[in-house]
């Protein structure tokens, strides 16, 4: 019977075996569904060519691997913030001393992999042939391919001492590395090489260095990024010289916004460049004033970039960030190249891994934890496209590694305690944390709550459409971790709820997901009888005992869009089977990210443990999206029933 409520133990979903997101991913996906974002299907060199043909200038960013695990967490946060500005790609340098090809969280390979898979950034991995045998390089390239990296910057690398000594049987020049990549991997990788506007410091002459650059391009390099320089005329002369010897691939200027006296000296020493005297004259008197130097560096970089862009010779700008963001962001904003409000291709964060290019459907439960979803589905061979399909046994990997640097909270323990409470005295203390997260107001100790275990980011813009309702229910112990308002045919360009191409319309069913007590659930089930034909619900405890009225455990589309010349796209679903995988993660976060802040057996730890053990996870969907959402009334009716005398209520335990 449709909408017949039923309870069960656990649907016994399995976490290993199948490698797709549904029982038969080939049957349930339609790979012919037109892509909402053509760039997802293009190689980097194709994106560049399309931008060059249209005259649409771009920017890109360089980062280096951090030295510590904490630095890795901070760098991933920086990736996420800078991704909002719309870089065409980022690149990650290769540090031989840091075991760059390993699986360490601070290695070049892992940082680049994280940028691609978990931050959705087109990424170039630097690779050097210095002190590496060809078989080692081949191994690194195979690993890069496996991790979803499709772009390599081929470099010779710097010698450990003062003089270059080739590895026995190894390569002596970047040209050799480019040839090796093309021989072993054909056209799989897009290859970038370095250009030196004043010539490489080890080259016999500028002309000799240009000859080597031409050899790298002839061997298969797709584009060039230059070393930093300080005057536009230096770059113009370099491009002219390249053109004269037949180099026709894109040449991107390397831009270094001066951010401090010490960092400038170090970079100049490494690159063996001479700083123009007019720049020295400005910097020397203010060398101890970091703010003044940074402001001057921004002004200088903006002026240089404008001259480059106005020349018509520059398709894009490549920034050496030194893992800092303020100066580069300010330069890009002043140039008008920073995208303040980027158009979302889909309502959730994308991965740039090639095998996920067709993916356009996900369960809503991971909306605020996209990195976790990507991690748990990383072993799938295919991804749902067009519709979620009959998901009778999705193979979600188990999430036990909460310590992984790309899944950890961006806030250190001390900050989390200030936000969530040095000491909890009751369940109501927990309610207050949720309330302050939603309100944005400081807590009783004067600290703002900027994250929760289930959401490490600021509130989504659409939350503002139901902020007062959310505040009201959280004060009552409806601890919301995910929600969306109902939307009926809003333009896809809407700044709050829009997504997808221009000219479309987006729709949403109201959705509410929360933790609450057993007593509240018992009253809620009584109230839901009145809304049986309108509201779908799924209620589960930490042990997996659950009750739902989802018809035949079928997925329910809760977000969809209609766009010119395309089929309906439904990128977000409420899938009852996937919910049972999500509930394990959702409950575990109480302990892993909140409870473990406190000493074992402490009152604060015991309060979190009690909620983990006794509360239920609930999701509600209001199917009547054209009408005002009834979910708030459902909650109000629930508490009205709770406030009656017990003899007036008929209870039904789940």
UniProtKB/Swiss-Prot annotation:
Known cofactor(s): FAD
Keyword field contains NADP: yes
GO CC annotation, single: cytosol
Active site (UniProt): 62
Keyword set, alphabetical order: Allosteric enzyme, FAD, Flavoprotein, NADP, Oxidoreductase, Phosphoprotein
Modified residues (Phosphoserine): 10, 18-20, 22, 24-25, 28-29, 102, 393
Alphabetized GO MF terms: methylenetetrahydrofolate reductase (NAD(P)H) activity; methylenetetrahydrofolate reductase (NADPH) activity
Region Disordered: start-end pairs: 1-41
Binding-site residues for substrate, renumbered to this chain: 158, 227, 320, 324
Record text on activity regulation: Allosterically regulated by S-adenosylmethionine (SAM).
InterPro entries membership: FAD-linked_oxidoreductase-like (IPR029041), Fadh2_euk (IPR004621), Mehydrof_redctse-like (IPR003171), MTHFR_C (IPR053806)
Catalytically driven reaction(s): (6S)-5-methyl-5,6,7,8-tetrahydrofolate + NADP(+) = (6R)-5,10-methylene-5,6,7,8-tetrahydrofolate + NADPH + H(+)
Enzyme's top EC category: oxidoreductase
Modification after translation, per record: Phosphorylation of an N-terminal serine-rich phosphorylation region increases sensitivity to S-adenosylmethionine and inhibition.
List of residues binding S-adenosyl-L-methionine: 455, 460-463, 480-484, 559, 572
Domain comment (free text): Contains a serine-rich phosphorylation region at the N-terminal and an eukaryote-only S-adenosylmethionine (SAM)-binding domain at the C-terminal. Through asymmetric homodimerization, the two regions are positioned next to each other and N-terminal phosphorylation increases sensitivity to SAM binding and inhibition.
Described purpose of this protein according to its UniProt entry: Catalyzes the conversion of 5,10-methylenetetrahydrofolate to 5-methyltetrahydrofolate, a cosubstrate for homocysteine remethylation to methionine. Represents a key regulatory connection between the folate and methionine cycles.
Family label: Belongs to the methylenetetrahydrofolate reductase family.
UniProt protein name: Methylenetetrahydrofolate reductase (NADPH)
Organism of derivation: Mus musculus (Mouse)
Name of the gene this protein is made from: Mthfr
């Amino acid at each position: 019977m449709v909408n017949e409520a039923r309870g069960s133990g656990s649907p016994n979903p399995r976490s290993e075996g199948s490698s797709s997101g549904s029982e038969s991913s080939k049957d349930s996906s339609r790979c012919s569904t037109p892509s909402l974002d053509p760039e997802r299907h293009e190689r980097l060199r194709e994106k560049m060519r399309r931008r060059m043909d249209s005259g649409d200038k771009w920017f890109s960013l360089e980062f280096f691997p951090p030295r510590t695990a904490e630095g890795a967490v901070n760098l991933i946060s920086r990736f996420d913030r800078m991704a909002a500005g719309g870089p065409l790609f980022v690149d990650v340098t290769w540090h031989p001393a840091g075991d760059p090809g390993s699986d360490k969280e601070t290695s070049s390979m892992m940082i680049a992999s994280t940028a691609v898979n978990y931050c959705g950034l087109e990424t170039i991995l630097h690779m050097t042939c210095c002190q590496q045998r060809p078989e080692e390089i081949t191994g690194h390239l195979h690993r890069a391919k496996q991790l979803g990296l499709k772009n390599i910057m081929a470099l010779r690398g710097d010698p450990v001492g003062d003089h270059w000594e080739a590895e026995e049987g190894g390569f002596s020049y970047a040209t050799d590395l480019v040839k090796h990549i093309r021989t072993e991997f054909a056209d799989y990788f897009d290859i970038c090489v370095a250009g030196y506007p004043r010539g490489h410091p080890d080259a016999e002459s500028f002309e000799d260095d240009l000859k080597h650059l031409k050899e790298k391009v002839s061997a298969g390099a797709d584009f060039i990024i230059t070393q930093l320089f300080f005057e536009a005329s230096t770059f113009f002369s370099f491009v002219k010289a390249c053109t004269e010897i037949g180099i026709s691939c894109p040449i991107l200027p390397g831009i270094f916004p001066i951010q401090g006296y010490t960092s400038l000296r170090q970079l100049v020493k490494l690159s063996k460049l001479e700083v123009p005297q007019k720049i020295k004259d400005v910097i020397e008197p203010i060398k101890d004033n970091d703010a003044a130097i940074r402001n001057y560096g921004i002004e200088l970089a903006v002026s240089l970039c404008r001259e480059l862009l106005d020349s018509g010779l520059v398709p894009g700008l490549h920034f050496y960030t030194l893992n800092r963001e303020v100066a580069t962001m300010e330069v890009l904003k002043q140039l008008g190249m920073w995208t303040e409000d980027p158009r979302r291709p889909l309502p959730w964060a994308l991965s740039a891994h090639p095998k996920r290019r067709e993916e356009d459907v996900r369960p809503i439960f991971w909306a605020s934890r996209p990195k976790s979803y990507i991690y748990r589905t990383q072993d799938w061979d295919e991804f749902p496209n067009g519709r979620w399909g009959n998901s009778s046994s999705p193979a979600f990997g188990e999430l036990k590694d909460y310590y992984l640097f790309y899944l950890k909270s961006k806030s250190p323990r001390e900050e989390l305690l200030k936000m969530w409470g040095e000491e909890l005295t009751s369940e109501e203390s927990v309610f207050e944390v949720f309330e302050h997260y939603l309100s944005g107001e400081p807590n009783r100790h004067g600290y703002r709550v900027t994250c929760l275990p289930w959401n490490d980011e600021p509130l989504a813009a659409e939350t503002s459409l139901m902020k007062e309702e959310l505040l009201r229910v959280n004060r009552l112990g409806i601890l919301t971790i995910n929600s969306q308002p109902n939307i009926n045919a809003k333009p896809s360009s809407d700044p709050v709820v829009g997504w997808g191409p221009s000219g479309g319309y987006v729709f949403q069913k109201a959705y509410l997901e929360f933790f609450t007590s057993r007593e509240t659930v018992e009253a809620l089930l009584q109230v839901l009888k009145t809304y049986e034909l309108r509201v779908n619900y799924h209620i589960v405890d930490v042990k997996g005992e659950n009750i739902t009225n989802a018809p035949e455990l079928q997925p329910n589309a809760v977000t969809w869009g209609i766009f010119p010349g395309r089929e309906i796209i439904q990128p977000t679903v409420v899938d009852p089977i996937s919910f049972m995988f999500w509930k394990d993660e959702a409950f575990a976060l109480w302990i892993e990210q909140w409870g473990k802040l406190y000493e074992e057996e402490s009152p604060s730890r015991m309060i979190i443990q009690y909620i983990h053990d006794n509360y239920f996870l609930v999701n509600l969907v209001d199917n009547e999206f054209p009408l005002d959402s009834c979910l708030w009334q459902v909650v109000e009716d629930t508490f009205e029933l709770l406030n009656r005398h017990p003899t007036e209520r008929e209870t039904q335990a789940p």
